């Protein structure tokens, strides 16, 4: 078995807990696509964010309109997944639903 470098590199957040575009609050799940974009379920901020490779801040791709049950809101997203048609799905935990989005970044 090979050796590992045990020094991590911050690829999203890392600027303390908060709701600015360069911060996360209770991230719970990530997905990394073929372009090395990192998608983060950011439960404490009720949003899903996309961090492009080497970005200093993320882009809100779902939620981000406060905690709530409207279609443009999330309540503690805890997971996400993608299909092969360009849609992504968010586990909207405390709204007891799965939301589907077409991503266009």
Question: Where on the chain are the PLM-derived regions?
Answer:
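Conserved blade-register residue in beta-propeller folds
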Residues: 1-2, 50, 100
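Residue-level detector of Asp-centered blade-edge/turn motifs that repeat once per structural unit
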Residues: 32-35, 82-85
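Conserved beta-propeller blade signature
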Residues: 38-39, 88-89
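Long terminal segments
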Residues: 85, 93, 100-105
């Amino acid at each position: 078995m090979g050796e590992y470098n045990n020094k991590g590199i911050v690829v999203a957040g890392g600027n303390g807990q908060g709701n600015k575009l360069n911060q996360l609050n209770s991230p719970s799940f990530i997905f990394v696509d073929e372009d090395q974009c990192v998608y983060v379920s950011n439960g404490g901020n009720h949003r899903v964010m996309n961090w492009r490779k080497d970005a200093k801040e993320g882009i809100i791709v779902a939620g981000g309109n406060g905690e709530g049950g409207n279609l443009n809101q999330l309540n503690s997203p805890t997971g996400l997944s993608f299909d092969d048609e360009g849609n992504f799905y968010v586990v909207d935990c405390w709204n007891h639903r799965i939301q589907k989005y077409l991503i266009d970044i």
